[in-house]
């Protein structure tokens, strides 16, 4: 598939004609919210096999082949040119589709209230073909070792219809915040621990969960080894029951990184104990902080490269946001938090406010600024086809196990287009 960036004066019909496709195909596959008023800088995924590349100054067949993980000989063959051809700037090369590799993908779902809303159920139905796992956030562990379940309306039937594995997410949330005291009890009180693990197995059987995913955050640093031992005991029990075990890890760049979020998460131990880990590689840009990319490529790479020193690549699942933020300027610490927006909403906001979308090459993320009806300045950072492609390239380069999305309900159709175009999503079979 081709990623196209809208330029001044572009129309869908002209773009479709250029790539020998139709406006309907482009509109429907991208679910374009503004087909009659494209935004400069907006990305469009062209639904064609392979893609085209326009030669730039300094390019050679070899350098282009390296960029697209193919060979100069193959590019020469499919484009019917000589291997030693001197490429002219602007010459258009066809890049054939690369072989797909297997990947595991997960998405979190966060229901509110007493049932899963119809909108979230529909999001789960639409995403499930592209997912290995779907996780309902979350089963909240209690101080006595019991569990409070989240709404699960129709999730079992939705996942079973697409052979998607239902993930059971266990948290140390208490009063809507991660609790280190709750964590201390769960990890250190033997009676509570045994009850919790048995409750997890019983609920997994009842609801059809096959992966048990621990998202224990902001634990006390002194509970680091207690958490490791808890996971060893959980793994032994779950594996006997035919269940997988996984964990969510704070985005660390060293074993000695300081901070409440990081210190109790032992990358090496988790890599040895559990079946896979999800690295929470997002929220550099967050609602209470200054405007910036939510998951800039450099910091994401730094976390993964550290993780690779502690565990094998086939246990690492990269976390990825399905959202961005709209900040009101000027940013002031403790002021009005930024508003979460989906990639589709971001495009609509840019269109309504006549804003052009820019792209930060360092962060590999799109952004724009606008002035609202009350004359307040805003800055929006979000995701588009280019930014998610940068993450897919990182997965391929570092040979990671897969990708995990936080969270469904925020529309980003281009992600699923590119995911299915470049990867075979693994579907699990359990005995």
UniProtKB/Swiss-Prot annotation:
Disruption phenotype: Inactivation of the gene does not impair vegetative growth nor prevent the development of resistance to heat, chloroform and lysozyme. According to Kodama et al, the germination of the mutant spores induced by L-alanine is defective. However Chirakkal et al reported that the mutant shows wild-type germination kinetics in L-alanine. N-acetylglucosaminidase involved in cortex peptidoglycan degradation during germination. Cleaves only partially degraded spore peptidoglycans. Recognizes muramic acid delta-lactam residues specific to spore peptidoglycans. Chitin binds at residues 148-149, 174-177, 218, 280-283, 406. The gene is sleL. Its EC number is 3.2.1.-. PROSITE patterns: GH18_2, LYSM. Residues 103-431 form the GH18 domain. InterPro entries: CFLE_GH18 (IPR041704), Chitinase_II/V-like_cat (IPR011583), Chitinase_insertion_sf (IPR029070), Glyco_hydro18_cat (IPR001223), Glycoside_hydrolase_SF (IPR017853), LysM_dom (IPR018392), LysM_dom_sf (IPR036779). This is Cortical fragment-lytic enzyme. It is an enzyme of class 3 (hydrolase). GO terms for molecular function: chitin binding; hydrolase activity, acting on glycosyl bonds; oligosaccharide binding. One of its GO terms (biological process) is carbohydrate metabolic process. It comes from the Bacteria. Residues 2-46, 51-95 form the LysM domain. The keyword Plastid does not apply. The keyword Metal-binding does not apply. GO terms for cellular component: endomembrane system. Keywords: Germination, Glycosidase, Hydrolase, Repeat. The active site is at residue 217. CDD domains: GH18_CFLE_spore_hydrolase (cd02874), LysM (cd00118). It holds the Pfam family LysM. Induction: Expression is regulated by the sporulation transcription factor sigma E. Belongs to the glycosyl hydrolase 18 family. Chitinase class II subfamily. SMART domains: Glyco_18, LysM. It is found in: Spore coat.
């Amino acid at each position: 598939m081709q990623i196209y960036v809208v330029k001044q004066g572009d129309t869908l019909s002209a773009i479709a004609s250029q790539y020998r496709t139709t406006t309907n195909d482009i509109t429907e596959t991208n679910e374009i919210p503004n087909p009659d008023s494209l935004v400069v800088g907006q990305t469009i995924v062209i639904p064609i096999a392979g893609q085209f590349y326009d030669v730039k100054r300094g390019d050679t067949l070899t350098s282009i082949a390296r960029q697209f993980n193919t060979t100069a000989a193959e590019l020469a063959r499919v484009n019917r040119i000589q291997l030693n051809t001197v490429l002219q700037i602007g010459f258009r090369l066809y890049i054939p589709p690369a072989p797909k590799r297997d990947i595991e993908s997960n998405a979190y779902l966060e229901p509110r209230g007493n049932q899963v809303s119809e909108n979230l159920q529909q999001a789960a139905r639409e995403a499930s073909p592209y997912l290995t796992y779907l996780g309902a956030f979350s089963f909240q562990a209690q101080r006595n070792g019991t569990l409070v379940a989240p709404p699960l309306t129709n999730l079992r039937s939705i996942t079973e219809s697409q052979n998607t594995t239902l993930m059971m997410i266990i948290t140390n949330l208490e009063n809507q915040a991660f609790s280190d005291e709750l964590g201390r009890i769960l990890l250190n009180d033997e009676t509570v621990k045994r009850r919790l693990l048995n409750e997890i197995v019983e609920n997994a059987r009842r609801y059809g969960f096959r992966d048990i995913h621990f998202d224990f955050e902001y634990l006390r640093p002194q509970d680091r080894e207690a958490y490791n031992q808890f996971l060893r005991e959980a793994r032994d029990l779950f594996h006997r029951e035919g269940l997988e075990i996984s964990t969510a890890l704070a985005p660390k760049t060293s074993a000695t990184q300081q901070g409440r979020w990081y210190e109790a998460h032992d990358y090496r131990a988790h890599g040895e104990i559990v079946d896979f880990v999800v690295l929470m590689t997002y929220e550099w840009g967050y609602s209470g902080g200054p405007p910036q990319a939510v998951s800039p490529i450099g910091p994401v790479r730094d976390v993964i490269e550290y993780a690779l020193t502690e565990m094998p690549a086939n246990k690492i699942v990269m976390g990825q946001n399905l959202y961005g933020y709209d900040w009101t300027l000027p940013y002031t610490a403790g002021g009005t938090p930024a508003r979460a927006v989906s990639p589709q909403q971001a495009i609509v906001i840019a269109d309504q406010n006549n804003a052009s979308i820019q792209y930060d090459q360092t962060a590999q993320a799109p952004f724009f600024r606008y002035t609202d009806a009350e004359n307040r300045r805003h800055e929006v950072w979000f995701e588009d086809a280019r930014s998610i492609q940068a993450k897919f390239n990182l997965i391929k380069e570092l040979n990671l196990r897969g990708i995990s999305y936080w969270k469904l309900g925020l529309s980003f159709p281009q992600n699923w287009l590119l995911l299915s175009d470049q990867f075979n999503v693994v579907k699990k079979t359990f005995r």
